């Protein structure tokens, strides 16, 4: 998954285009026949941190997603803003994934992208001052 996302993001230039590609990839996944939600999220939900061999894999996956998003954002934002935005964007895609699974609605990726656009506008306005 991380490799696919990385490859997809590498095909476009600019922070917005890369993040849009990230959300587009998720929307395509949400519409696929194999989509059953996030295995890593389910593992954490089922076992919590009581099964370290499972939870560590899930946490590593989430950290890899976070690093991927941070890598995109660091081209435009300082370290603090990059961390803040990446954390919120990861929460948005996690929520979109859960919602898409529960309600069979792949448009949640699009809604999360629109929320991300608003966050980017706000962050750019703050950094301009």
Q: What role is predicted for each listed range?
A:
Residues 2, 17-20, 50-75, 87, ...:
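Amphipathic alpha-helical packing segments from all-alpha helical-bundle domains
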Residues 5, 9, 48-51, 73, ...:
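Short amphipathic alpha-helical interaction patches enriched in hydrophobic/aromatic residues
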Residues 6-32, 86-89:
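Hydrophobic alpha-helical connector segments
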Residues 12, 22, 115-129:
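N-terminal hydrophobic signal/anchor transmembrane helix of membrane proteins
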Residues 29-32, 90-107, 119-126:
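Amphipathic C-terminal alpha-helical segment
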Residues 32-53:
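Amphipathic alpha-helical segments used for helix-helix packing
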Residues 42, 84-91:
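Residue register of alpha-helical TPR repeats
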Residues 77-83:
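Short, charged helix-capping/linker segments at alpha-helix termini
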